[in-house]
A protein has these predicted regions:
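Peripheral peptide segments
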Residues: 1-142
Length: 142
């Protein structure tokens, strides 16, 4: 069984071009999710509002100011469809894989129905928690 963590991007970013894993390190929340994923999952990817699925140590990208928070439902559906296709291309939606979503509902709300149509198991360990509660959840497990 392979475990893959999916970590949402964050508003706080470095200003200079960086690898995706480093770009979001300005955010304490991202740092906690990253640390948890690196310690507990076999692989992890970043869910970017602008780029979709990013390899953490892939090519450097420029800082950007884009989020799904204010996106329409249709925009979120289009984004989710693109992310789903990217995950398929990475063979990340197979029967022997469990996806752990470390993101808010803006990032998984429209993606979850697509994932539920596959044989992949999906877990959202911090579902229903507020930001402070999520930080405490990660602190307790790192």
């Amino acid at each position: 069984m392979t475990e893959i963590g999916l970590v949402s991007c964050t508003k706080k970013k470095r200003e200079e071009s960086s690898s995706p894993a480093e770009l979001y390190m300005e955010s304490p929340y991202f740092r906690k999710m990253r640390e948890f994923c690196e310690a507990n999952h076999d692989l992890w990817y970043i869910l970017s509002a602008k780029y979709g699925v990013l390899e953490p140590y892939g090519e450097p990208i420029e800082s950007y100011n884009e989020t799904l928070r204010d996106s329409t439902v249709e925009e979120k559906r289009e984004w989710a469809k693109s992310v789903f296709e990217q995950l398929q291309a990475k063979d990340s939606l197979e029967k022997d894989i469990t996806l752990f979503i470390h993101a808010g509902k803006d990032y998984y709300g429209e993606l979850l129905p697509l994932l539920e149509q596959t044989d992949t198991e999906v877990r959202i360990p911090t579902e229903g928690l507020g930001l402070g509660e999520k930080m405490a959840w990660y602190n307790d497990r790192i």
